[in-house]
């Protein structure tokens, strides 16, 4: 019987405390699934202005540029029976702002955060077996452990995992950040932190963590190629033996159409007619005519990664059909303005809400018939899993986690759970939507089977947490083997 592990998950955002994207959902859900398997799990994140329910623990000094900054350590907890502790690193200068990222001093802000986390653990007397880091904001932690704490007995047996949620966001900064990190110029070489004339926090995490993973098996393979590797494919190929792909999950208690209080009407796979009542409620909410036509939904950041150029290219021919389209998202001005113009052009068929509204998102999952994710690349994707749960049939591009989770009905008769295309071309997307519409309109029995298969699928966190558990133990063995080699 393996002994329970002590795990610290470090993330720049954790739902429901602070969220900009899917990383927050992962950081809020995975700890609960690990705790359910008997492990002692704690979480660390910055204390942003919007995080309210916290208790003061202590002040700790953190060295920055030769002077001392104060890290105020506060504690909250994740909702749920386990009450998992969340440690919040507070500093008014660095984190009391309107947003979470995108500031000129992000390099210093998250350098401070990473140093503060490693200063906090001895004070807490919480000695983790695993520090699980997530995305570029936490990349310096594996580096600091190997370079700054290599002789610190407190961390002697601690292994690090570094999870890449999206390789496109790399945390690259000017060379002078090395001084703030208290690192010599020796680190500004391609074999270490130098990345095309800058310093990369993402590269630090990939290079110095004991094991690295990303959030689907397919994406773990894709990022080792020039097409998807964002100029880090060479390093990732070098670390291929230490690179894993573990699919994210979704919280099946939160995302359950039978109990979701945000819905107009609750339903399950045995009462699919009630999904139609949610469609009518969505049409009324979005000021569309209440008609029995197929409703397509899209919930997305409005950025080029999400395949919106393909969608824009086919909207005119698509909207000539007898259907409706509901879009929720925010992002690049170009796409916000483009879709807002189409909303005016097709006002009886198309509804657009710019922004993020979590309640409306649930109404779209419950009210739409077809859910679109035509992504150029998609490390994992949660939207397609949620749409399956709510009986909305996904139309997706076969890439990353979308390929790992969605099987095309026509390629896999009797087991398919959606519709997929591979060529990144507008016509391929339109043809695939039309295939889905044909089944919806002309094969209603097959469509109901498709809905039920999706609703019965298991993309809960339990299986994914088991894979992380295996990876944690593997990282510990790797760490101990390295210690004995040195010792």
Swiss-Prot record:
Give the matching SUPFAM superfamilies.
Answer: UDP-Glycosyltransferase/glycogen phosphorylase
Q: Which GO terms describe its biological process?
A: glycogen biosynthetic process
Cited CDD domains: GT5_Glycogen_synthase_DULL1-like
Q: Which GO terms describe its molecular function?
A: alpha-1,4-glucan glucosyltransferase (ADP-glucose donor) activity; alpha-1,4-glucan glucosyltransferase (UDP-glucose donor) activity
Q: Which reaction does it catalyse?
A: [(1->4)-alpha-D-glucosyl](n) + ADP-alpha-D-glucose = [(1->4)-alpha-D-glucosyl](n+1) + ADP + H(+)
**Residues where ADP-alpha-D-glucose binds:** 19
The pathway where this protein functions is: Glycan biosynthesis; glycogen biosynthesis
Enzyme class, broadest EC rank: transferase
- Regions crossing the membrane: none
Q: Which UniProt keywords apply?
A: Glycogen biosynthesis, Glycosyltransferase, Transferase
Similarity section: Belongs to the glycosyltransferase 1 family. Bacterial/plant glycogen synthase subfamily.
Q: According to its UniProt entry, what is the function of this protein?
A: Synthesizes alpha-1,4-glucan chains using ADP-glucose.
Q: What is this protein called?
A: Glycogen synthase
| Organism listed in the record | Moorella thermoacetica (strain ATCC 39073 / JCM 9320)
Please state the gene responsible for encoding this protein: glgA
């Amino acid at each position: 019987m393996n002994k329970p592990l002590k795990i610290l998950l470090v993330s720049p955002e954790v739902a429901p405390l602070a969220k900009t994207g899917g990383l927050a959902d992962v950081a809020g859900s995975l700890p609960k699934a690990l705790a359910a398997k008997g492990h002692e799990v704690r979480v660390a994140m910055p204390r942003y202005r919007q995080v309210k329910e916290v208790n003061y623990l202590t002040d700790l000094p953190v060295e920055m540029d030769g002077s001392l900054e104060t890290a105020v350590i506060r504690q909250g907890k994740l909702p749920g029976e386990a009450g998992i502790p969340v440690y919040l690193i507070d500093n008014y200068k660095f984190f009391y702002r309107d947003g979470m990222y995108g500031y000129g001093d992000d390099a210093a802000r998250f350098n401070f955060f990473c140093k503060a986390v490693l200063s906090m653990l001895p004070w807490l007397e919480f000695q983790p077996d695993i520090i699980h880091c997530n995305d570029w904001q936490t990349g310096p932690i594996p580096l600091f452990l190997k370079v700054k704490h290599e002789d610190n007995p407190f961390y002697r047996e601690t292994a690090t995992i570094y999870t890449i949620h999206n390789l496109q966001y790399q945390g690259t900064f000017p060379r002078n950040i090395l001084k703030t990190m208290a690192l010599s110029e020796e680190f500004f070489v391609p074999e270490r932190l130098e990345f095309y004339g800058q310093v990369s926090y993402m590269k630090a995490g990939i290079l110095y963590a004991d094991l690295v993973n990303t959030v689907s098996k397919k994406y773990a393979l894709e990022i080792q190629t020039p097409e998807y590797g964002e100029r880090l494919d060479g390093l990732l190929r070098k670390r291929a033996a230490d690179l894993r792909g573990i699919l994210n999950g979704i919280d099946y208690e939160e995302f359950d159409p039978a109990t979701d209080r945000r819905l107009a009407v609750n339903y399950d796979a045995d009462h699919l007619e009630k999904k139609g009542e949610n469609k009518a409620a969505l049409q009324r909410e979005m000021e569309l005519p209440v008609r029995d036509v197929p409703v397509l939904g899209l919930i997305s950041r409005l950025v080029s990664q999400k395949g919106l150029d393909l969608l824009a290219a086919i909207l005119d021919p698509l909207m000539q059909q007898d259907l409706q389209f509901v879009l929720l998202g925010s992002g690049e001005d170009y796409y916000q303005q483009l879709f807002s113009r189409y909303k005016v052009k097709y006002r009886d068929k198309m509804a657009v809400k710019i922004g993020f509204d979590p309640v409306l998102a649930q109404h779209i999952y419950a009210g739409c018939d077809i859910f679109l994710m035509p992504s150029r690349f998609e490390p994992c994707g949660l939207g397609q899993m949620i749409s399956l749960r709510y009986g909305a049939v996904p139309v997706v591009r076969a890439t990353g986690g979308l390929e790992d989770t969605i099987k095309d009905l026509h390629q896999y008769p009797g087991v398919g759970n959606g519709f997929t295309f591979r060529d990144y071309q507008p016509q391929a997307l339109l043809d695939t939507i039309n295939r889905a519409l044909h089944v919806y309109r002309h094969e209603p029995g097959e469509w109901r089977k498709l809905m039920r298969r999706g609703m019965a699928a298991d993309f809960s966190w339990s299986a994914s947490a088991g894979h992380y558990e295996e990876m944690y133990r593997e990282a510990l063995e790797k760490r101990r083997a390295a210690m004995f080699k040195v010792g």
